[in-house]
């Protein structure tokens, strides 16, 4: 029987895993870096923490806390522009505490990695403009192609 992330965190107190996806690049390289995620305690998350959470649709996500609000968190991937709101403590399973990369250990609580998180946070407005700007031309091209296909098919 396969164990869920929740089962592993409950049993062992931590989860060691590789990531799938590019939303946390360059911090996490897809299928290359090992993540150590520790089970979340009763305390609230802190600004710039990187929690593992489970969306209401069952999808597991690891993104950075951009803002801590009274009843929820605003979370975003380091390589994303979309701010996800409404993530509450009930969604949070654990927090990224360590990244093992090419034999080097990156402690997420170290001053160096906290500074890295701060720089990611500060760069968010520029990153959002860049990523949105890159996606708009592609979306326009796709719409034009669909429009042409519909009108050629009708002719």
Language-model region placement:
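Extended hydrophobic leader/signal-anchor segments used for secretion and membrane insertion
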Residues: 1-155
